[in-house]
Amino acid sequence: MDAQEAERAGLVSRVVPLERLMEEALGAALMICEFSHIAVMAAKESVNRSFEGTLNDGIMFERRMFHALFATQDQKEGMDAFVNKRKAVFTNT
């Protein structure tokens, strides 16, 4: 399977020319750095755990993470920023 086929199948979100690969990857990393670090860690752990256990186990884990994240200050900040159409300033708490 080549990159274009993987994109059509939904396995990758975007295909870029090799000469722009590092620029695009760094741009994605910078964007992720602007998110709540707590939420990014939870998302990464959810993806890593998706390879372990059953689909139901994964759904239950994601549900627990969702509820845990709802108790954070970053969740409140993110919602307030969204409602007030401003950029969120996360404190990672």
Features from the language model and the residues they span:
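C-terminal long alpha-helix characteristic of the crotonase
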Residues: D2, A9-M60, H67, Q73, ...
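Interdomain hinge/lid region at the active-site interface
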Residues: A71-Q75, A81
